[in-house]
A protein has these predicted regions:
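Flexible, low-hydrophobicity surface segments
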Residues: 1-50
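Active-site-proximal alpha-helical scaffold in enzymes
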Residues: 2-6, 150-160, 189-198
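Helix-loop-helix junctions that connect adjacent transmembrane helices in secondary transporters/permeases
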Residues: 38-126, 291-372, 499, 576-587, ...
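Glycine-rich loop/linker segments at domain edges
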Residues: 51-97, 186-272, 350-360, 426, ...
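C-terminal catalytic domains of large/alpha subunits in multi-subunit enzymes
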Residues: 127-132, 161-168, 197, 223-347, ...
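Thiamine diphosphate
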Residues: 139, 143-165, 169-170, 386-394
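Catalytic phosphate/nucleotide-handling subdomain of diverse soluble enzymes
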Residues: 351-415, 421, 431
Length: 657
């Protein structure tokens, strides 16, 4: 419905009557996969969108398969099941876009992470040339993956063509955001492991079933990424077998969300590690240290290499901060209704999407008349602090102060260089390489122009906004050089540089979380007393922003662990809590002090030794809290969230109530 104003549109909607043919509600993936289940899409009669089955190459041994290892009586055998829930991104700004026609072209202003991709999808959807579409992303904040999908912009672009090119605003409410945009996939994991007496993982298997809701969205890629992450963090000495299913149901369709399947798999693998350690009487920290991904590890399927790792140092640093050894001993064998525990979890996370998908980014630099530099990017700032870091990178590559770099903080596909956008913790790694490359080219152009002005000088360099010679003598300021370049009758030139980084490498970021909790058993209440994340994200470009990024991710992880869940009426399939009153996000009043620590490594594949940090802080929080509850109570809770009702049921089943 398109109307002059919102009131008219609402009145018109009330005049529309829709008749629905009701079908049985299928909300769970297991229901949808059962024989005789209603078929949601005719092209997938079993409701399975996709399936994958991966086996690592087996070394020469007496074992012919992973299953043989998992049945070998010489090893300790573990089996378990872990389930995660559906949650929403809850970015403060809901999806919104404006569309109008200008000079025969469609202009769309939208809150998006991927403006260049939005333009392409609009063109494909409408069957028109991409050059006849202009997409503008203003300076906005918040997306977490939900604005990585093109949902409303093609509709809005089409609507403006139906009203004579007039401006159309498509503003999505919070309730519509919950119901009709994307969310995090609920995924179930059935896992098995074989472990020898020296705490070494010999083999593991994982079967993951992802609830895709009614539409494909990112499809199978998220659960595929999840089982890949399950394989990578720890080393299997003999072999690994993973199977993954993506299944259609009647839920709202999940899609990309911070971590892209890794928070789900991390809950499974880190709960499994603690459960094994508890059954064997091992220290969970020592068990993890005995099995970490080694430096130089190469994934057997995608070839991603571990170029640097500080994970062992992260674990020790976090353990020292929380007082791991002392608290583990102190909190053993507790009694009473209120108990405390300490838990941990580790993670690995790749940086960007290569080699699974394209990784490319471009940058442009333009000399201003006062000697400062204009930086143009297609990479998007969505609140993560990217523009600040990009300015720092450009300044370092050129050799000028950061305040002399003026970044264009919005993207316009008519003028911005191409970049695929903000997702996969890629921008400081992929776009950063483009910035470094262009910055070095720009620097050489400045020095080459200075050499024309001072042909007898040698060893030219840029220092403190000056061109200096090999002896360190100042020859000309950058401001004067710029004025000369613009207005000299003999040497006028507009100094610019532009280039592309087609990234064909990847690397792993690492880290861990330690949490101390207090559990009120009779009421099922978990209070986080202390929590610390320790990250190896390579070299930190901006430590203050890095700390802020970690704090935000930890907050999101606490909600994932304890309170957040999209709930549905099992009879009708209706979402019951699609608003910020009934959907329980934690606030600052629910958090302890959030501590972020770092172990800096110098990753040789990163533009400045840096690697992923955007998504990782969320990943290990939920399993660390769950494992702390396990130590406090002795009860293994294998589903998220750890809500009071669920905990009371589990504690009752465990004989504590």
């Amino acid at each position: 419905m398109v109307a002059e104003d919102e009131i008219t549109a609402r009145r018109a909607l009330e005049l529309i009557r829709v008749e629905y043919e009701e079908y049985p509600v299928v909300l769970e993936a297991e229901q949808a996969m059962a024989e005789g289940a209603p078929v949601l899409h005719e092209e997938h009669p079993d409701n399975v969108l996709a399936k994958m089955d991966l086996r690592t190459p087996m070394p020469e041994s007496d074992f012919h398969s992973v299953e043989d290892v998992l049945a070998c009586p010489a090893y300790y055998q573990f089996r378990g099941r872990y389930d995660t829930q559906q949650v929403q991104h809850c970015h403060i700004e809901n999806p919104i876009s404006y569309a109008w026609m200008e000079g025969g072209r469609i202009v769309v202003v939208t809150s998006t992470q991927i403006p260049h991709i939005v333009r392409r999808v609009i063109g494909q959807a409408m069957g028109i040339g991409w050059g006849s579409i202009r997409v503008i992303k203003p300076y906005i904040g918040g997306g977490f993956g939900n604005k990585q999908e093109v949902l409303y912009e093609p509709l809005n672009a089409w609507l403006t063509t139906q009203v004579g090119g007039r401006c159309v605003r498509l503003d999505v409410s919070r309730e519509e955001t919950f119901q009709n945009t994307r969310s995090r996939h609920p995924i179930s994991f059935d896992v098995a492991a074989a472990v020898d007496g020296d705490m070494r993982l010999m083999a593991r298997s994982c079967t993951a079933v992802s609830n895709q809701g009614g539409y494909a969205s990112h499809g199978h890629s998220i659960v595929a990424n999840a089982v890949t992450g399950f394989r990578q963090l720890y080393l299997d000495r003999i072999g690994h077998h993973s199977t993954a299913y993506t299944v259609y149901t009647n839920r709202p369709a999940p899609g990309a969300m911070r971590g892209y399947g890794i928070p789900q798999c991390n809950f499974a693998v880190e709960c499994m590690m603690d459960d094994i350690a508890r059954e064997k009487g091992w220290d969970p920290k020592a068990f993890r240290l005995a099995n970490l991904m080694p430096l130089g590890y190469v994934d057997p399927f995608n070839g991603i290499t571990c170029h640097s790792t500080g994970l062992a140092e992260c674990i020790e640093k976090g353990a020292d901060f929380i007082g791991w050894a002392e608290l583990r001993e102190k909190y053993q064998n507790q009694t009473g209704p209120v108990r405390r525990g300490v838990g941990m979890a580790c993670f690995s996370y790749k940086t960007g999407v290569y080699p699974i998908s394209l990784e490319t980014a471009s940058a442009r630099m333009v000399l201003n008349q006062d000697g400062t530099v204009q930086l143009h990017l297609g990479a998007t700032e969505i609140g993560q602090g990217g523009d600040t870091v990009f300015s720092q990178m450009a300044a370092q590559a050129i050799g000028i102060p950061t305040e002399d770099v003026h970044i264009v903080s919005f993207q316009d596909t008519d003028t911005a260089p191409f970049d695929t956008g903000a997702y996969a913790s890629r921008q400081t790694y992929v776009t950063g390489k483009a910035i470094k490359k262009v910055g070095e080219e720009f620097r050489e152009k400045l020095l080459a122009y200075a050499a024309e002005l001072f042909p007898d000088a040698s060893g030219l360099d840029i220092r403190e906004r000056q061109i200096v010679d090999g002896a360190g003598e100042a020859l000309i300021s950058l401001a004067d050089l710029a004025m000369t370049a613009f207005y000299s009758l003999e040497h006028s030139v507009h100094i610019t540089a532009e280039d592309t980084n087609h990234c064909k490498e990847n690397t792993f970021a690492f880290g861990c979380c330690f949490a101390e909790v207090e559990v009120d058993i009779p009421v099922g209440k978990v209070r986080v007393l202390r929590i610390v994340n320790v990250h190896d994200s390579g070299k930190l470009i901006n430590p203050a922003l890095a700390e802020a990024q970690v704090h935000g991710g930890m907050s999101m992880g606490i909600g994932y662990a304890l309170t957040e869940e999209m709930k549905f009426d099992p009879k009708t399939g209706r979402l019951l809590n699609g608003n910020l009153l009934d959907y329980k996000m934690p606030t600052s009043m629910d958090h302890p002090e959030l501590t972020a620590l770092f172990v800096e490594t110098d990753d040789p594949s990163g533009p400045f030794g840096n690697k992923a940090l955007g998504e990782p802080p969320t990943i290990p929080v939920a399993p660390a809290i769950r494992n702390a509850v396990l130590q406090a109570t002795g009860v293994a809770v294998n589903t998220l969230p750890l809500s009071p009702q669920k905990l009371v049921e589990e504690f009752t089943r465990g004989g504590l109530i």
